[in-house]
Amino acid sequence: MKKILFLAGFALLTSCGSVQNTKKQPFTWEGANLYFLLTDRFQNGDKSNDINFERTEKAAVLRGFEGGDLRGIIQKIDSNYFSDLGINAIWMTPLVEQIHDATDEGTGKTYGFHGYWAKDWTELDPNFGTKAD
């Protein structure tokens, strides 16, 4: 008798399924998990665009372009990097064309790798990618 009750209870428990709520929740900024990324430092997805505008002067340590670009960001999105972290909003540094020459701020030559030394607000800096990216 105990065996029958055990089997009946086991069958009942294993046959019960849970209902999944598949309704997608709307995005709200209040619930956002924001990821800030410095585009040039994030992921180099296209090594062919690493040097543009003859930006060949040796920069001080960590003061030059390192190669991160739109292609690298797209690769990480496609690999679910952000969604695996629970990220649903990305804040990127500006991608507009930066000044072409290096500047010495007292720490050695520095390029506008950070995106905040805009030269042309209407063009993408080719170090970061193209409009096709």
PLM feature spans:
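Short, linear, compositionally biased motifs with a strong N-terminal bias
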Residues: 10-11
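Sec-dependent signal peptide recognition
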Residues: 2-7
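C-terminal motif of bacterial Sec signal peptides marking the signal peptidase cleavage site
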Residues: 14-15
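N-terminal structural segment of carbohydrate-active enzymes
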Residues: 19-133
